[in-house]
Amino acid sequence: MPKRRRGEKKTTYFDYNLLFIIIFLLCFGLVMLYSSSSYTSANKYGDSAHYLKLQARNIAIGLVFMFYFAKKDYHVWRKFGRLAYWGALGFCLVVLAKVPGLTRSSHGQSRWIQVGPIGFQPSELAKIAIIIYLAMLIERIPKQLDKVSSMAKVGIRLVPLVLFVAVNNLSTAIIILGIAVCMLFVASPKYKEFFVVAVLGVLFIFAFINIASYRSDRVEAWKHPETAGDKGYQTMQALYAIGSGKLFGKGLGQSLQKLGNVPEAQNDMIFSIICEELGLFGAVCVILLFVLMLWRMMVIANNAKDLYGALLVTGIMSHIAIQVVLNIAVVTNTIPNTGVILPFIS
């Protein structure tokens, strides 16, 4: 929000179209979360609405913060760029060190920091931190980004955080790299340099896949899920769910695959249940909602008062877009399993 002169009437700009899309996706997400998780939740916790209640609580907290920060001048985040970056880096180090009493494991990986009832993944914090930090850096040297050396200096500053995240969570590291590339491209759209960056990014991903054997196993399971045993089971069941939904689906709440067949149906595989219950028609509608959301964000970025505001929106837009594409690509077995959730719905 720009500063106003003395005597000027304060004006705020609020995109109600974007707000409506967000609220609709959140409400739709609650419905689908309950539908996909009620069976598992009842068996595990004795309460079919356990996951629904947790999600509703988190949404309520998120909406409070959203409306609070929507009234604030976004330039205030510029002051926290370095703090956000170094804070995220520090939390990632805590997870890597597996500090007793501060970290907990999930699905065999130590990715969480747990302090009493409060738990979070530093890798998720790193996504937001990189947006705030990179927007601050780029705004200070926009014209210098035409030089390859200046772009390389910015990229080098991101390397420690990306590497620390990639050790335990390669998919999130890929998302962070994608966000950074999109923000740099908006600031300096030089195609040759970004082709080089893309090649280096592919080499980075290839190297990390081969470092850990379980990542190589995921690639093999992706190529031949039908013969991969337990490693390909989730993918095969998700594909069965998608195929059985046909054009208009079996009907809301009528999924059979959610009855213990699709592991983590309420998490990264929820799109397969959407396809089964609402069919291809429902899946396309969900994708169109995300497209509309990204379009509204692009409009906001184009009309931002300054480069910093445009970069913040670009970073958030890139984050959501990359995560949606990765999630749907995993569910449809277009790429190996990454564990990336579907924003606003999972």
List PLM regions with ranges.
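N-terminal Lys/Arg-rich, disordered targeting/topogenic segments
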Residues: 1-6
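N-terminal membrane topogenic signal
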Residues: 7-22
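Hydrophobic alpha-helical transmembrane segments of multi-pass inner membrane proteins, especially
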Residues: 23-27, 35, 45-234, 272-333
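Alpha-helical transmembrane segments of multi-pass integral membrane proteins
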Residues: 27-29, 243-244
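Short linear Ser/Thr-Pro motifs
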Residues: 35-38, 255, 346
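TM-adjacent membrane-interface loops and short helices in multi-pass inner/ER membrane proteins
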Residues: 221, 225-267, 271, 278-282
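Extracellular/periplasmic helix-loop-helix junctions in multi-pass membrane proteins
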Residues: 331-345
